[in-house]
UniProtKB/Swiss-Prot annotation:
It comes from the Bacteria. Gene3D superfamilies: D-tyrosyl-tRNA(Tyr) deacylase. It catalyses: glycyl-tRNA(Ala) + H2O = tRNA(Ala) + glycine + H(+); a D-aminoacyl-tRNA + H2O = a tRNA + a D-alpha-amino acid + H(+). GO terms for biological process: D-amino acid catabolic process. This is D-aminoacyl-tRNA deacylase. The keyword Metal-binding does not apply. GO terms for molecular function: D-tyrosyl-tRNA(Tyr) deacylase activity; Gly-tRNA(Ala) deacylase activity; Ser(Gly)-tRNA(Ala) hydrolase activity; tRNA binding. One of its GO terms (cellular component) is cytoplasm. A motif (Gly-cisPro motif, important for rejection of L-amino acids) lies at residues 137-138. The gene is dtd. It comes from Thermoanaerobacter sp. (strain X514). Keywords: Cytoplasm, Hydrolase, RNA-binding, tRNA-binding. Homodimer.
Length: 149
């Protein structure tokens, strides 16, 4: 499982010109689910997202998590994060999970983040979306449940 976590002032998702989800301060998380992901990857990712300390404390140090600031998550499924561009010029998406299975793990990730005390809004699975991301910093973190960046 791969995620791009962006610290935001606000974020929103629109489908067909209509805003379907929005958040204030927190994270917009673009998540790609791989063919070899399982529940352990979901638990790892949920824990990382909720406890990632990238919000400033009173001294200006990145020391606070979503839980500490009462932040929200806007979780958007993005299979293109699994695109392999090492060969050729067109991405190979063979590592992206099939939609039915990906949706199962996506929903589990939503539930696991919420269980840990953070409000989650989502995009629309398998839809063409417009994602508004008002970065704060910017602070962008890459997380992969199987690789170290």
């Amino acid at each position: 499982m791969r995620a791009v976590v962006q610290r935001v002032i606000r974020g929103e998702v629109s489908v067909d010109g209509e805003v379907i989800s929005s958040i204030g301060k927190g994270f917009v998380v673009l998540v790609g689910i791989s063919v070899d992901d399982n529940e352990n990857d979901v638990m790892y990712m949920a824990d990382k997202i909720v406890n990632l300390r990238v919000f400033e404390d009173e001294e200006g140090k990145m020391n606070l998590s979503l839980l500490d600031i009462g932040g929200e998550v806007l979780l958007v499924s993005q299979f293109t994060l699994l695109g392999d561009v090492r060969k050729g010029r067109r991405p190979n998406f063979m590592m992206a999970q099939k939609p039915e299975e990906a949706l199962k793990y996506f929903n589990l990730l939503v539930n696991e983040i919420e269980k840990r005390g953070v409000s989650v809004k989502t995009g629309k699975f398998q839809a063409m979306m417009k994602v508004l991301i008002e970065n704060d910093g910017p602070v962008t973190i890459l997380i992969d449940s199987k690789k170290i960046f």
